Amino acid sequence: MQIRRKHPNPAVKVESLSYVVKVPEAQPQNILEEIVWHKEIEVDKLRERLPLLELRQKIANTAPPCDFLAALKQGKTQPALIAEVKKASPSKGVILEDFDPVAIARTYEQGGATCLSVLTDSKFFQGSYENLTLVRQAVSLPLLCKEFILYPYQIYYARSKGADAVLLIAAILSDQDLAYFVKIVKGLGMTALVEVHSLAEFDRVLAIEGIELIGINNRNLETFTVDLDNTRQLLEARGEQVREKGILIVSESGLHTATDLAKVKQAGANAVLIGESLVKLPDPALGIQKLFENLG
């Protein structure tokens, strides 16, 4: 299913009156499309408050980003762990009521995480860019900004808030946008984690030059259902191409146990992104150690 961009139902103005005619096409087809439509409005407002020129000047005065990709290659664990600072999601609602992003990030670092991911979407995941900045100030690990990026502006904004890497979701970006965004990310010294869910998306991304890190999401973002076998299926189909290109693979979503990790590691994943199952633990640092103690 194609994810539509701009809300197709603009206001109609007649003299001093303004009204909206509701049509069936004006309703989002699924959760992902609803998120994208809201993000369009959010980014427009952000641009008004902070123009791109000012944003780029701000970035020019910041320290260079950490090397997210190199950290994953060196991995403190096998597979390398990207631990996610996550309060809520559309499928689960609030995961942790007493949410302290800094405390969570520090326990992840103590537990042996290689990198961290911070949710910045506010409406659907109750995240924020403030959380990203706070975590950046509290830990030394490379940080991924977990966001629904539609425009180059968001990449610059994420960098200004402390991100070392950004998520680019193939389902909501054209091939042209993906290729262009990857160049912008690299130009800023950052890493692009390009996310796919289906074999069709995987093929699209593998055909784009310059992509070094691909995330296979076991969650269908249209329905938010999870199939852990998705990583194995996609790597069975295209694993040879991935290895030939020297691309690192991150398995995302639905990972809860050491058995789950062993399964995706055997399938060919170099890293895993885990959030919900760690956030809920009373001691995430200990939880990380137990998850990885027998994987080697």
Curated annotation (Swiss-Prot):
Pathway field: Amino-acid biosynthesis; L-tryptophan biosynthesis; L-tryptophan from chorismate: step 4/5
Lineage start: Bacteria, Bacillati, Cyanobacteriota, Cyanophyceae, Oscillatoriophycideae
CDD domains per UniProt: IGPS (cd00331)
MF (Gene Ontology): indole-3-glycerol-phosphate synthase activity; phosphoribosylanthranilate isomerase activity
EC number: 4.1.1.48
Keywords of this entry: Amino-acid biosynthesis, Aromatic amino acid biosynthesis, Decarboxylase, Lyase, Tryptophan biosynthesis
Pfam family membership, one: IGPS
Keyword Methyltransferase belongs to the record: no
SUPFAM superfamilies reported for this sequence: Ribulose-phoshate binding barrel (SSF51366)
Single biological process term from Gene Ontology: L-tryptophan biosynthetic process
Catalytic activity, reaction form: 1-(2-carboxyphenylamino)-1-deoxy-D-ribulose 5-phosphate + H(+) = (1S,2R)-1-C-(indol-3-yl)glycerol 3-phosphate + CO2 + H2O
InterPro entries linked: Aldolase_TIM, Indole-3-glycerol_P_synth, Indole-3-glycerol_P_synth_dom, Indole-3-GlycerolPSynthase_CS, RibuloseP-bd_barrel
Gene from which this protein is expressed: trpC
The name this protein goes by in its record: Indole-3-glycerol phosphate synthase
Family to which the UniProt record says this protein belongs: Belongs to the TrpC family.
Amino-acid biosynthesis as UniProt keyword: yes
